[in-house]
């Protein structure tokens, strides 16, 4: 959570303090009446909770955790981070699942229970998770079981950076400089290094 809030605080004109975002995550955790996965889902994705942005998915704000917390809308990975970090504060074991094209959260104690934060916390079994993948990539898309393996915090940060880069390239290319400067400080695997080299050519 701190890395993603630092990302948000690094943009021009933003509040350099991460305190508000951390305070909001703390508040969400304190306000959860039942500290279980089911309790978290009801608490975070209920009537007045966070939800997927279905009107403007590629809005750059959907990749900025402070904006997601303030607006209560986001994309799958940032909504998943809200769930993961609130759960961490409550001792609820959860892991992030970086499936290509979509992001899920898995119960840390049940390898067949997934949560789709973008779909208001819908629960999925393994078969339904595969079906969700094919609903995005096509019914004949090859599915590798490795797609349902947990990912670490650095992988989540890199993926959020990739999403934000794509959104800014489409919407606000003039704001890419600050993001590129930040990305140069974040170690990335070879595929992302190639993408970063292409981004450097746009400067």
Feature annotation, model-predicted:
Residues 1-203:
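A structural boundary/capping signal
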């Amino acid at each position: 959570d701190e890395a993603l809030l630092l990302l948000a605080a690094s943009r021009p004109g933003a509040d350099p303090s991460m305190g508000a975002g951390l305070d909001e995550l703390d508040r969400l955790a304190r306000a959860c009446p039942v500290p279980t996965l089911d309790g978290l889902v009801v608490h975070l994705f209920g009537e007045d909770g966070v939800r997927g942005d279905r009107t403007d998915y590629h809005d750059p704000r959907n990749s900025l955790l402070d904006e997601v917390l303030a607006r209560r809308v986001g994309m799958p990975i940032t909504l998943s981070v809200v769930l993961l970090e609130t759960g961490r504060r409550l001792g609820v074991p959860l892991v992030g699942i970086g499936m290509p094209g979509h992001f899920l959260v898995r119960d840390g104690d049940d390898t067949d229970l997934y949560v789709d934060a973008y779909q208001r916390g819908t629960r999925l079994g393994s078969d339904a998770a595969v079906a969700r993948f094919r609903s995005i990539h096509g019914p004949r898309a090859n599915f590798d079981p490795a797609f349902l393996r947990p990912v670490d915090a650095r992988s989540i940060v890199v993926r959020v950076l990739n999403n934000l880069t794509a959104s800014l390239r489409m919407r606000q290319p003039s704001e890419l400089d600050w993001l590129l400067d930040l990305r140069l400080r974040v170690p990335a695997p070879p595929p992302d290094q190639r993408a970063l080299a292409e981004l450097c050519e746009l400067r």
